[in-house]
């Protein structure tokens, strides 16, 4: 025979497990880096031209073209958004009618007058605003080359400061025609750009809601 206390403990354990913090997954494309493919074996045909040479031509610019090449992303994001909404409804009704009474009830009540009134009114307003600014630079790696020549890039930068580990991640699709002579491109010119700035450490843990507080927040009816 099972004890009721064991079932209660199991239910409490499941409830607390449901309130546990969900690990946050990165929004950037993985992996963060890619190695270039191995070049073919060198051949010695006995002439100046070597078809197995994997380096860049002498008069070719140094812009990234292949998997493993690096590119500098200039992050310059400034986004402002404002939203407002409102709703207003008003409805009123009034009804009155007489109901004749028959038989011996007529002498008692004569006529019964019935009336009904109703009113319904609703008014609501809402608004939201957001402003985000992110400036900086990060160097990423070409992880894939699409059939049309666009470059899939991703990379991260980690900084260990005292007791906290801060990192910046970036991924997106770059058109090689937008890359400048300094081998850089603005984040506003990157398609499907995903920028992530986060941290791990005591400061980040202090900003996280405790498990017991999340438990009462989930079961609170208000």
From Swiss-Prot:
InterPro entries xref list: Flag_Lring
GO molecular function, one term: cytoskeletal motor activity
Signal peptide positions on this chain: 1-18
Single Gene Ontology BP annotation: bacterial-type flagellum-dependent cell motility
Lipidation (S-diacylglycerol cysteine): 19
Keyword Ribonucleoprotein appears in the UniProt entry: no
Protein's name according to its UniProt entry: Flagellar L-ring protein
